[in-house]
Amino acid sequence: MAGKARVHELAKELGVTSKELLATLKEQGEFVKSASSTVEAPVARRLREKFGSKSAPAPAKSAGNGATAAPATSATPATAAAAAAPAPAPAPQAPAKPAAPKPAAPQPVAPPQPAAAAPTPPPAASAPAPAPAPSAPAPSRPGPTPGPRPGPAPKPAPRTPRVGNNPFSTQQPVDRPIPRPQPRPGAPRPGTPRPGMSPNNMPPRPAGPRPGAPAGRPGGPRPGPGGRGPGGGGGRPGGPGGGGGGNYRGGGAGGGGGAGGAAAGGFRGRPGGGGRPGQRGGAAGAFGRPGGAPKRGRKSKRAKRAEYENMQAPVVGGVRLPHGNGETIRLARGASLSDFAEKINANPASLVQALFNLGEMVTATQSVNDETLELLGSEMNYVVQVVSPEDEDRELLESFDLSYGEDAGDEGDLEIRPPVVTVMGHVDHGKTRLLDTIRQANVREGEAGGITQHIGAYQVLTELDGNERLITFIDTPGHEAFTAMRARGAKATDIAILVVAADDGVMPQTVEAINHAQAADVPVVVAVNKIDKEGADPQKIRGQLTEYGLIPEEYGGDTMFVDISAKQGTNIDALLEAVLLTADASLDLRANPDMEAQGVAIEAHLDRGRGPVATVLIQRGTLRVGDSIVAGDAYGRVRRMVDEHGEDVEAAMPSRPVQVIGFTSVPGAGDNLLVVDEDRIARQIADRRSARKRNALAARSRKRISLEDLDSALKETSQLNLILKGDNAGTVEALEEALLGIQVDDEVELRVIDRGVGGVTETNVNLASASDAIIIGFNVRAEGKATELANREGVEIRYYSVIYQAIDEIESALKGMLKPVYEEKELGRAEIRAIFRSSKVGNIAGCLVQSGIMRRNAKARLLRDNVVVAENLTVSSLRREKEDVTEVRDGYECGLTLTYSDIKEGDVIETYELVEKART
């Protein structure tokens, strides 16, 4: 049939039920679901052959020539008419050539012979062949004698062809050899042409016919030159034999070749043994060797199963994604889905769809936080490893053949350097006063509110055992908002001095300083300060610090405790001696001064006249004027270096703190400083760090909107936008972290849209006007016409000099932005005793006030049998003895109307008012 047949159509045609046919198809490995499923043409042909052979009648032998009657189900009308001829005339025969084989009439054959045995063709046929059909006479041509046409043979049961000779087979002979089929009684002997070899009764083929191939003639094809008739006649002497079955392609069982010719040939168009000269024969299956025509047709079940197992695993929503085997994927902070897709060779759109199905709405180029990347990776069986900032920076420097944190050269190049000491402790415990006493200076008076809000770095010359020694001191803030500054100070130090007030004891920032020092693995010297004050108890301090692992030497520990008074200058020399002894005993303080300088930016600020200024502590190497430097995302060339006394420095050795002028922008506090060969390399490193920092900040600040809380996300929320300006980078960073840590309520949100170092400029005012933001100036003022522009645009600028004042006021502003919360306050209750109906105002309730007061325009609810009938009502009118009143007290009768008419006697009216409640 021209198109694909359906199962129920084939079942009706073959005379079986659809259920039986479905079972047969499933046994053969076909993918069918119901009686409406379609069946390919080769499968339908196989089914017709199978069920047709079962229902074919038994063959009946003819009395004259031994030919059998054709089966009624498959014989064509022309073949049936030829078989019914009573006295067929013998066909005219040309003289046979000596070398041509002479096929004999079909006769019963002996039991099957081995496959390797080559059967000998019998002499010329003595039985006459049936006459051809009148509609297509076969003219006699001079040439080889065509083989006789025996009568139609009984239709054989479908046999499995040999693998090597069947180009449509889906199996290979080396995998699963197929046994040779047994010969049938009345069939031609192997090696002889099969009777009735026409395209209508050829053996079944697993694959479909070639589209557009002409159908075979009824009665068999006309024999042509070279014996190209049914079964393949003899060829020319010395030439290749003819192939059988001109309408079939591929290497099948061909006819016998001529004497001295090639072996049995194949079908037309394929090298099958007896093809054109120069072509290789394809009889590999006959000799048990692999080869032959390429495999075609349907895939085997094993191939389909392997293909199914190798398919990409689907995830939620049916999106097909790569399925990993637990591989580790390294991604930078703030990576996008496009970066992830590039690592696993996937489509970014598929990752976007997969995240949407998981409840996250992210675009392909948007920075994604670490948790989302890890969640998506686990769905695809990947382990996502977000590269830490340290590893990321190390890989960046390695790409430029640079390294940080190691001394160049060998042991002979190292020289002794001064120790770096960080003074840490709780606020107001005397850290800056101790440094003032050591430096013989007054630093504390310059700090607003008497608390340190910067990191100061100083180098002090002291004397130990008659030898002058240098000590570098770093002063850190003690306020709770400066946690990041204390952590940076601990990382850049060799020894930590923990200052504890003898009259105050261990405080929260004291414990935090201990944790920073222990995390940085630096030794600690405890200075018990304010021993001159009343109530001072140094022994109590020693006992408290024992709980945190700082055990005094007099208690058998290894921590040195020194009782001092920074105000009186008591035991300051003993403290410095303890610092130097600890450095000599516990630390190897050496560095190579001859390499390119490396250090850390302690703090940075923007100076009006000098530009960006960074306080840098040199850790190794020597920094000179003119060096190309990079610190974080800032780069430049050293134009000038100044020490803590304001004097110019040409070269800064290890452990020397200096102020560096020449950066193009303000570096971040705690950024590593590195000297490179040229400005181009410094700019490239700074640009790549800036891009990474921007992506990481975008991923952190992106508010995750999931499908579950989409409704709440779409609700109107109050947002307070801030622009932060400060005198140095560390203070701005500390202020931002402190403000973002304020937790008020989900209804209000704090957002820092811009931050910077320096005074308030007109650009800041314009940005604040466009975004409805408030400008916070910390230790800075507005520049030029910025104040006039702010007044004209209505932009609020607030100035602060103490950090906790800014935190308190911003928190109060956030609380003021909260939506008000109302609390219900009951006013009174009244029982309806009578109902009066009026055509003007409706039902009037005559009530007796049982408790409280009834007030006009008050909120009310109607209760019936203690069940609320109506809510959110209003007392629209209130009368007492025909007079309008504003309220009626307990024990009096009144008449009132409600904004609800379905009232009954015995109902209770309860009035209340909503009082705004302060939110905290």
From Swiss-Prot:
Compositional bias segments (type: Pro residues): 87-159, 179-193, 201-212
InterPro entries: EF-G-like_DII, IF2_II, IF2_N, P-loop_NTPase, Small_GTP-bd, T_Tr_GTP-bd_dom, TF_IF2_bacterial-like, TIF_IF2
Binding sites annotated in the UniProt record for GTP: 425-432, 475-479, 529-532
Superkingdom per UniProt: Bacteria
Keyword set includes Protein biosynthesis: yes
Region (Disordered): 33-305
Region (G3): 475-478
Main location, first listed in the record: cytoplasm
GO cellular component: cytosol
Chain spans, region G5: 565-567
Positions of the UniProt region annotated as G2: 450-454
Function, in words: One of the essential components for the initiation of protein synthesis. Protects formylmethionyl-tRNA from spontaneous hydrolysis and promotes its binding to the 30S ribosomal subunits. Also involved in the hydrolysis of GTP during the formation of the 70S ribosomal complex.
Protein name per Swiss-Prot or TrEMBL: Translation initiation factor IF-2
Organism, scientific name: Mycobacterium sp. (strain KMS)
Gene that this sequence comes from: infB
